[in-house]
Structures are given as structure tokens and as C-alpha cells.
């Protein structure tokens, strides 16, 4: 699902207003009502669509209404409902599954489903950019009051959130048929997949097999439009549940062009690379900040030109949002004249010397929810789609 510029601007406007008013319950609820009247739907970083609404727009039960008035230990006090995500089956009168999102009086975000409350994040802004889980580890149970103090529980949930914050989000599934071939307007032949060969890369400490085009495939020729981009599906590693699918793009640039998104779900993504001429230089993602993605519908993929400086680091010039979708960083490849062999953020794609004047990027974008539910976790395999604009 693609958003128009006006729709995206309206979503960003309401999300910014909700974030700024999250500390004032009455003002926050008023903004939620305005967003509900405008039919605002925001997408979480896990690709769940959150319909912004209050409890007047859903089928609420008695326990939920009690939570909104009284709260629950250790988050006692009035709560505000700001959204819901639902699963519908056919033309049924009620949703098959309904998860309600609540904001406590002290700013924490909680999820409610079938009488069980789950801790999700310590702030409203953090909620949109953190992996989501519904399990016994973050469930708030009725016997809590007899076990620990309020401060002990807050500390316990903060540690849980810190762990979830650094949990990479993998979009898994099978690529839809319309993305299973190279687009006809691209600069690579439609039978290009026959020329693919797998390479090994290290992704979050796990050896995965990725595929990349051969040098013969990428070699520009007179009858190819080297200024275009390629939409291409690549069959990546198999695991016990689903297949990881990746889209590669081929672009011409004098320096380096990186298309990436956050892979640790922290407040920013940081990438630095020495501009040395020798091979073997890898990225240390602890220096120059390339991407600050706050106050978006969710964190967006950034495409930007990067130039070397006297300090042998890359600076960003004229960043722009290229997509409204977000995912894990898979990597990028620099050009020969820059001299950086690869950019590693999640997975390195540059296992061989790159072609002069080109960089290779990969990123999935659109997907269905990939979320760990408390119920039937064996059925959480979801489909994902990917398109590189």
C-alpha cells in the first residue's frame, strides 16, 4: 500500500501532535479524537497497521472500560486508548482478534487483548520504533501486587524494553508473484536470476546466505539504461519458518549512495567508514550519524548522497525520504573512487571489489505483520513484499 504525499503529510502531522501531547491526558485524547474523525491509520515498525481511535469506536468489554478509568498495578491511574489493530475473517460481525493500545497516566504504552495486558514501551514515541511481543515476559498479571513493589516492576519492564529495543526485526515470508521477476524497464535482463551466485555474509552474528548479481550481469552496455533502478527478487536463506526475500537496486553515482534503515531500533542509525584506498575496510556503526528518523509514521528508509571529508568520514548532504516503509539494514556497496569496500549494517553485501561508479543496495519494504502473539505462536509466519523505488 503506497501513500500519497498529502496522506503521508497528514499522518506525520497527527503523529507529531500525539507525541507532543502524550504527557497531557486530556489534550492527548482530543488529538486522538481528531485523528479518529480523519480516519488516520499509522503503521508500526513491525508493519502492523494501527487505526487511531478511542474506545467509542470498538467493541470494548467491561475489563477494558475499567482499565481506562482505574488503570492496573503497577500502572495505576487513568488510561487513554489511542489505537487498535484487528484481524477480520470474511464479513464477520466482530474481529477475529483485537489488540487495543493504551497510554498510561505516567506515559507507558500497554497492549490489551482478551483480558490480558502487556507492557510494550516506556514512552509513546518509543512504541512506534520497537519490536512488539505478546508473551509471558511482558504480561501484567493480577498477582503482581503481592510479589514486588511498583518500582521493582518498572525496573523489570525497563530491562525488558531495552532487550526488545535491540532485537532486530526480520520481515520474513514469500515474495508475491508480481515481484518475482525483474521489471521490464530496468537495466538488467529478465533472465538475470540465472546469473546469480550466493555469497556468505554475517548478519547479527549469524552466517546467512545472500545472493547478488555477477559482475557480468552488472556490467553496463550501450543498450542498457544505467541510470535506472532494478526491482529484482532474490531467493535468500531458508530457515524453519519462512524464506527471506531481498530486493537489489543498481544505481550510478560518483560517490556513494546508501539506502538503509535502522537495524537496532535505537533513536538513530549510525554508520561510519574510512575513505581509505585499501580493501578490507568495514563499517564501524558507532560514529557519523546518517539517519535520524523521529516523528515519522514509522522509521523511513533514507536515500542520500554521501561525500568524504578531511576526517575520512562520510557526511550526509540533502537527505530525503525515499519510502514510507521500514525494515532491517541489509547493507550497501561503495564505489571504487571512494575506496570503501562495504557498508555493514545487519548484513554485508560487499564481499568482492565493487564495480566503479556503482553501489548495490538491498531492502524489503512493504509487508504484513510479523509479530509474536501470545496465542498460537506456531502460526506467526507471515508474507512479506518488497519493492525498491
UniProtKB/Swiss-Prot annotation:
GO terms for cellular component: host cell cytoplasm; host cell nucleus. It comes from the Viruses. The keyword Coiled coil does not apply. Keywords: Host cytoplasm, Host nucleus, Host-virus interaction, Modulation of host cell apoptosis by virus. It is found in: Host cytoplasm; Host nucleus. One of its GO terms (biological process) is symbiont-mediated perturbation of host apoptosis. Interacts with host MDM2; this interaction leads to the stabilization of host TP53. Belongs to the beta-herpesvirinae UL38 protein family. Plays a role in the inhibition of host apoptosis to facilitate efficient viral replication. Promotes stabilization and inactivation of host TP53 through interaction with host MDM2. This is Apoptosis inhibitor U19. It comes from Human herpesvirus 6A (strain Uganda-1102) (HHV-6 variant A).
Amino acid at each position: 500500500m503506497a501513500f500519497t504525499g498529502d496522506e503521508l503529510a497528514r499522518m506525520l502531522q497527527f503523529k507529531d501532535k500525539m507525541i507532543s501531547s502524550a504527557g497531557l491526558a486530556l489534550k492527548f485524547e482530543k488529538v486522538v479524537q481528531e485523528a479518529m474523525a480523519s480516519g488516520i491509520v499509522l503503521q508500526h515498525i513491525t508493519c502492523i497497521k494501527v487505526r487511531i481511535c478511542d474506545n467509542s469506536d470498538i467493541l470494548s468489554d467491561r475489563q477494558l472500560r475499567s482499565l481506562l478509568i482505574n488503570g492496573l498495578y503497577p500502572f495505576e491511574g487513568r488510561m487513554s486508548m489511542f489505537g487498535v489493530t484487528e484481524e477480520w475473517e470474511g464479513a464477520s460481525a466482530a474481529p477475529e482478534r483485537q489488540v487495543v493500545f493504551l497510554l498510561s497516566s505516567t506515559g507507558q504504552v500497554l497492549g490489551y487483548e482478551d483480558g490480558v495486558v502487556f507492557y510494550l514501551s516506556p514512552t509513546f514515541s518509543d512504541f512506534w520504533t520497537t519490536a512488539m511481543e505478546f508473551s509471558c515476559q511482558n504480561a501484567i498479571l493480577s498477582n503482581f501486587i503481592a510479589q514486588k513493589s511498583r518500582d521493582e516492576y518498572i525496573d523489570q519492564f525497563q530491562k525488558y524494553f531495552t532487550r526488545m529495543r535491540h532485537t532486530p526485526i526480520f520481515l520474513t515470508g514469500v515474495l508475491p508473484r508480481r515481484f518475482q521477476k525483474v521489471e521490464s524497464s530496468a537495466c538488467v535482463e529478465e533472465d538475470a536470476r540465472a546469473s546469480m551466485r550466493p555469497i556468505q555474509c554475517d548478519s547479527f552474528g549469524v552466517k546467512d546466505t545472500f545472493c547478488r548479481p555477477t559482475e557480468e550481469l552488472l556490467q553496463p552496455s550501450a543498450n542498457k539504461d544505467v541510470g535506472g533502478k532494478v526491482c529484482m527478487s532474490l531467493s535468500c536463506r531458508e530457515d524453519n519458518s519462512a524464506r527471506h526475500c531481498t530486493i537489489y537496486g543498481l544505481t550510478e553515482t560518483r560517490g556513494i549512495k546508501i539506502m538503509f534503515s535502522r537495524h537496532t531500533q535505537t533513536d538513530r542509525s549510525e554508520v561510519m567508514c574510512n575513505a581509505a584506498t585499501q580493501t578490507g575496510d568495514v563499517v564501524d556503526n558507532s560514529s557519523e550519524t546518517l539517519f535520524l528518523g523521529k516523528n515519522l509514521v514509522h522509521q523511513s528508509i533514507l536515500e542520500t548522497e554521501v561525500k568524504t571529508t578531511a576526517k575520512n568520514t562520510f557526511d550526509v548532504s540533502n537527505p530525503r525520504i525515499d519510502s514510507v516503509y521500514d525494515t532491517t539494514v541489509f547493507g550497501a556497496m561503495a564505489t571504487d573512487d571512494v575506496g570503501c569496500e562495504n557498508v555493514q549494517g545487519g548484513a554485508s553485501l560487499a564481499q568482492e571489489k565493487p564495480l566503479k561508479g556503482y553501489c548495490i543496495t538491498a531492502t524489503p519494504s512493504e509487508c504484513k505483520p510479523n509479530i509474536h502473539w501470545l496465542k498460537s505462536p506456531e502460526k506467526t509466519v507471515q508474507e512479506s513484499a518488497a519493492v525498491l523505488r
